[in-house]
UniProtKB/Swiss-Prot annotation:
Modification Phosphoserine occurs at: 20
Record PTM Phosphothreonine, positions in chain: 34, 48, 117
Assigned protein family: Belongs to the IAP family.
Record's subcellular location: Cytoplasm; Nucleus; Chromosome; Chromosome, Centromere
Protein name: Baculoviral IAP repeat-containing protein 5
Keyword Kinase on entry: no
Gene Ontology terms: cellular component: centriole; chromosome passenger complex; chromosome, centromeric region; cytoplasm; cytoplasmic microtubule; cytosol; interphase microtubule organizing center; kinetochore
N6-acetyllysine found at: 23, 90, 110, 112, 115, 129
Organism: Sus scrofa (Pig)
Subunit structure: Monomer or homodimer. Exists as a homodimer in the apo state and as a monomer in the CPC-bound state. The monomer protects cells against apoptosis more efficiently than the dimer. Only the dimeric form is capable of enhancing tubulin stability in cells. When phosphorylated, interacts with LAMTOR5/HBXIP; the resulting complex binds pro-CASP9, as well as active CASP9, but much less efficiently.
GO biological process, one term: negative regulation of apoptotic process
Gene name per UniProt: BIRC5
Domain of life of the source: Eukaryota
Length: 142
């Protein structure tokens, strides 16, 4: 009988899983922001066509790009998202009690909902602006 697998969101609590996301990461040996150090700081690599070095904290969902070889991932994370609870965890995730883990994951879920809500609000505002412009153009043409 095989061991049960973790839900995808929980797999990101495992550093090795986060490291595995850093395919084609531009900074390897001799750099401060290696995949191992990025993953230790909570980041996953989620590149886009225009942002090949885009990394996102799996916990607070803060996205950072424009990395330089000497950037320290932990310091950058603290500077741009000082309230991220991931940064204050002092134990390995495998050492957390179930209660500690669930309390922590509740914070991650809240962060995810806040990020998704913010994205939807921006999307709505952009659509509303386009519709408003279209209505104004219709009114002006009459």
């Amino acid at each position: 009988m095989s061991a049960p697998s973790l839900p995808p969101a929980w797999q990101l609590y495992l550093k090795d899983h986060r490291i595995s996301t850093f395919k084609n990461w531009p900074f390897l040996e001799g750099c401060a922001c290696t995949p191992e150090r990025m993953a230790a700081a909570g980041f996953i690599h989620c590149p886009t066509e225009n942002e090949p070095d885009l990394a996102q904290c799996f916990f607070c969902f803060k996205e950072l790009e424009g990395w330089e070889p000497d950037d320290d991932p932990i310091e950058e994370h603290k500077k741009h998202s000082s309230g991220c609870a991931f940064l204050s965890v002092k134990k390995q995730f495998e050492e957390l009690t179930l209660s500690e883990f669930l309390k922590l994951d509740k914070e991650r879920a809240k962060n995810k909902i806040a990020k998704e809500t913010n994205n939807k609000q921006k999307e709505f505002e952009e659509t509303a602006k386009k519709v408003r412009c279209a209505i104004e153009q219709l009114a002006a043409s009459e």
